[in-house]
């Protein structure tokens, strides 16, 4: 019998990423775990609908036995079974992030006995979670280089707080992992701005695009009007294509916050990324830790290691026999497998 791993949900940033990473790694390695203090660092601790959906999805995909899988629970015991490929559908029942549920179960399906399709309904454009276009245009091309083949499709947008969005991913078992080397970003090839609107006046998007154009030379600028029943909501994205990597930054519009202020916040984030020679942005760095650990080698550079990144690394090192090295030099932090 494999040893039970004990995790403290309050460690590091104390959010839901500890639980999501633990579920992924438990399904992959077959190691059971207990986590206490789930989301202890959040204003509303314990399992929310999004986290509970991730637990239930993981349970179904590997026939796990679970204790504590209920709303508000701050303790969970998860004993995994065997990961099975198949056609899965999960509903969050709120505007909780669909992509974070996918992020939990897809790595396990890289080791399944056949191809899979996973569809999740819930929120698709959330302030604190990667949107589907980030997964599709930034993460998945990098995963493909690593030998991981999955394809995400956004079927319907669902803005906070209404939800109602649908995201689906098709994924195949991985034959072998390749290493990823992302030490240098390279020169910028082009930049693209995009605004999504649902039930919001078009002039809001035009003002947001104007703010982006005031700071960057954009190769493309697009405004997409979505059906009103997918809103109301608004997101602004700016994609930076460089020689070695494409990064995408986004922000979700807020009520009673002007279009100019919303777009200016995004401009500030992109300028911070471009001011550093690092290849990888803060959010992408979090996404690369697990596949890099599974490959057993590789490296990337990031401007500053976030608490989120350090917490994720700590969880990965509890389940896998890998050790990460973080070395600061020349204005970047080089993250690699020792």
UniProtKB/Swiss-Prot annotation:
Q: Where does ATP bind?
A: 103, 283-287
InterPro entries of this UniProt entry?
A: RNA3'-term_phos_cycl_insert, RNA3'_phos_cyclase_dom, RNA3'_phos_cyclase_dom_sf, RNA3'_term_phos_cyc, RNA3'_term_phos_cyc_type_1, RNA3'_term_phos_cycl-like_CS, RNA3'P_cycl/enolpyr_Trfase_a/b, RPTC_insert
Broad class of the protein's primary localization: cytoplasm
Q: Which PROSITE patterns does the record match to this protein?
A: RTC
SUPFAM superfamilies noted in UniProt = EPT/RTPC-like, RNA 3'-terminal phosphate cyclase, RPTC, insert domain
State the compartments where it is located: Cytoplasm
Report TM segments.
Answer: none
- Record field: catalytic activity: a 3'-end 3'-phospho-ribonucleotide-RNA + ATP = a 3'-end 2',3'-cyclophospho-ribonucleotide-RNA + AMP + diphosphate
Indicate yes or no for the key word Aminoacyl-tRNA synthetase: no
Q: What is its EC number?
A: 6.5.1.4
The catalytic residues are: 308
Q: What class of enzyme is it?
A: ligase
Cellular component annotations (GO), alphabetically ordered = cytoplasm
Q: Which GO terms describe its molecular function?
A: ATP binding; RNA-3'-phosphate cyclase activity
Which example biological process does GO assign this protein?
RNA processing
Keywords of this entry: ATP-binding, Cytoplasm, Ligase, Nucleotide-binding
**Main role?**
Catalyzes the conversion of 3'-phosphate to a 2',3'-cyclic phosphodiester at the end of RNA. The mechanism of action of the enzyme occurs in 3 steps: (A) adenylation of the enzyme by ATP; (B) transfer of adenylate to an RNA-N3'P to produce RNA-N3'PP5'A; (C) and attack of the adjacent 2'-hydroxyl on the 3'-phosphorus in the diester linkage to produce the cyclic end product. The biological role of this enzyme is unknown but it is likely to function in some aspects of cellular RNA processing.
Q: Which NCBIfam families match?
A: PRK04204.1-2 (NF003246), PRK04204.1-3 (NF003247), RNA_3prim_cycl (TIGR03399)
Q: What family is this?
A: Belongs to the RNA 3'-terminal cyclase family. Type 1 subfamily.
For this entry, the protein name equals RNA 3'-terminal phosphate cyclase
Natural source organism: Escherichia coli O127:H6 (strain E2348/69 / EPEC)
Query: What is this protein's gene name?
Result: rtcA
């Amino acid at each position: 019998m494999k040893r039970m791993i004990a995790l403290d949900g309050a460690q590091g940033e104390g959010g839901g990423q500890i639980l999501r990473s633990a579920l992924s790694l438990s399904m992959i390695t077959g190691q059971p775990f207990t986590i206490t203090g789930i989301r202890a660092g959040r204003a509303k601790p314990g399992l929310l609908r999004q986290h509970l959906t991730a637990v239930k999805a993981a349970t179904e995909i590997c026939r796990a036995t679970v204790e504590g899988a209920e709303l508000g629970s701050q303790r969970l015991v998860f004993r995994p079974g065997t990961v099975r490929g198949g056609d899965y559908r999960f509903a969050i029942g709120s505007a909780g992030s669909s992509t974070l549920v996918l992020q939990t179960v897809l790595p396990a399906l890289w080791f399944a006995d056949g191809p899979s399709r996973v569809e999740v309904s819930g929120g698709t454009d959330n302030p604190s979670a990667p949107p589907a276009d980030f997964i599709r245009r930034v993460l998945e091309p990098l995963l493909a280089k690593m030998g991981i083949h999955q394809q995400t499709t956004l079927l319907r947008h669902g803005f906070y707080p209404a939800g109602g969005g649908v995201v689906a991913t098709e994924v195949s078992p991985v034959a072998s992992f390749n290493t990823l080397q992302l030490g240098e970003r390279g020169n910028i090839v082009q930049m693209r701005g995009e605004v999504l609107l649902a039930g919001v006046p078009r002039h809001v998007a035009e003002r947001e695009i104007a703010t982006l154009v005031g700071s960057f030379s954009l190769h493309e600028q697009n405004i997409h009007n979505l059906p009103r029943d997918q809103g109301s909501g608004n997101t602004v994205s700016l994609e930076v294509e460089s020689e070695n990597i494409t990064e995408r930054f986004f922000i979700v519009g807020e009520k009673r916050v002007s279009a100019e202020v919303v777009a200016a916040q995004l401009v500030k984030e992109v300028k911070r990324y471009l001011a550093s020679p690092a290849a990888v942005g803060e959010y992408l760095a979090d996404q690369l830790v697990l596949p890099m650990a599974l490959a057993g080698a590789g490296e990337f550079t990031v401007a500053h290691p976030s608490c989120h990144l350090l917490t994720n690394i700590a969880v990965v090192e509890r389940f896998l026999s890998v050790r990460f090295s973080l070395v600061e030099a020349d204005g970047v932090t080089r993250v690699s497998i020792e």
